[in-house]
Amino acid sequence: MSVDSPQPVPSHPLPTARPEVPTPGTAAGAGRLLSRPVLAWASWDWGSAAFNAVMTTFVFTVYLTTDAFGGEDRASVVLGWGLATAGVLIAFLAPVTGQRSDNGGRRKLWLGVNSLLVAVLTGLCFFVFPRPEFLFLGVALIALANVFFEFAGVNYNAMLTQISTPRSIGRISGFGWAMGYVGGIVALVLVLVAFVEPIFTWFGSDTTDSLNIRLVAVFSALWFLAFAVPVMFAVPEVPRKAKSAQLGFFASYGLLFRRVKAIYRTSPHTIFFLLASAVFRDGLAAVFTFGGIIAAGTFGFTLSEVIVFAIAGNLIAAVGAVGGGFLDDRAGPKRVIVISLIGLLIAGSAVLILGPGTHEFLGFIWTGDTTFWVFGLMLTLFVGPAQASSRAYLARLAPAGQEGELFGLYATTGRAVSFLAPALFATSITIFGEQRYGIIGILVVLLAGLLVLLPVKPPAKVAPAVAPSY
């Protein structure tokens, strides 16, 4: 069916999916940007940067793809397939785990449990020594941590409707992403001055067997855990739904399918958006997952230079997320996402075409370093708004009390195709024999996501989703 299939036209403007009144479990002060619940909620994003920025983007995966683990090309391929495998697990399990935390009144509990598991797996990366036989252990730990991180993210994203109103949901979502980027800056600075290029000598600066880099994993685990705590006290738990909470695990899939059918009948563009965002979000994730790897392997950045770039990139991304959040509340999330995807395609193409050599472009002489700094930072500028507006788009359409399940579907549809970017990244390297060409795989996914999104209606023109409670 086309996404533009005729739908019944109401005689009055379509209402927003969520009324501007508190729903059960909504935190006191919801909607105010600097309120206690919003700050506590955003603290989780701040802490999660230790996993996103330090572990999976700019430090630990860069470490995993060095020559110590058998060569950058081989290690990049193993990492790509490892993350693709993690995506399959998330695709099958995320919506039901979200549904069960909604129905059982355990959204906050499972956010805490999954966050703890991420911290433990991150800490275990300390035992990944710089030898080829440890590559699969390192990839397995990072991949499994990604699984539980996504499960935690389902519950975390679902809380957005508890701390915001329809008029503030875009800027609060953007504020959360910005807090994550700024948290990433602080974490990366600490990693740089304490472990990678220490300003004083201590046992954590010892480079024997890459002890300093392995200790970064311990630091990241503790950082994430510490900043994940505030949300557990500031945002109330959602109420338990007695009847649907009694469903067994496999019976939950039956309820899930009934709800998806009901949402499709009442608000088909909600489903269309889930499918479109699945594609482009996979490309967004790949920009960060493989950005540091490309900086080091293709453009010759040292680990210290990668971290300095990451600090600058997170600052630019934070500005983009905040600006995009305010634009979201005024112009709508779809416009923000489309503009961001076009910007990403332009910047990514420039990185690919210009590459690490010296070229003349737009009347200037571009070296590899200049190319990556200019267009790499341009990439980070557009990632934040696309991520924040995608979350805000779905939160506007979520049926009250079923946010966790819908964000579970959000994770599942994303992870159902999450093998695309890692697989195309790995395949492009295999075909062309050079890490640089992995960028082609990422660009293909971003372009496909943009094309699938264009026919999807913005939230203001979409009927609210209605789904059965059990």
Question: Model features per residue range: what roles?
Answer:
Residues 126, 223-234, 354, 439-470:
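Multi-pass alpha-helical transporter architecture, strongest
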Residues 121, 133-152, 279, 362-385:
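Hydrophobic core of transmembrane alpha-helices in multi-pass small-molecule transporters
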Residues 72-75, 195-222, 366-367, 427-446:
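A membrane-interface helix-boundary motif in multi-pass transporters
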Residues 53-76, 289-309:
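Short amphipathic helix-loop junctions that connect adjacent transmembrane helices
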Residues 21-39, 236-275, 470:
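Juxtamembrane intracellular "pre-TM" segments in multi-pass secondary transporters
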Residues 101-117, 329-344:
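Cytoplasmic membrane-interface "Motif A"-like loop-to-helix N-cap segments
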Residues 115-132, 342-365:
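C-terminal ends and interior cores of transmembrane alpha-helices
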Residues 92-106, 319-333, 429:
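Helix-to-loop junctions at the C-terminal end of transmembrane segments
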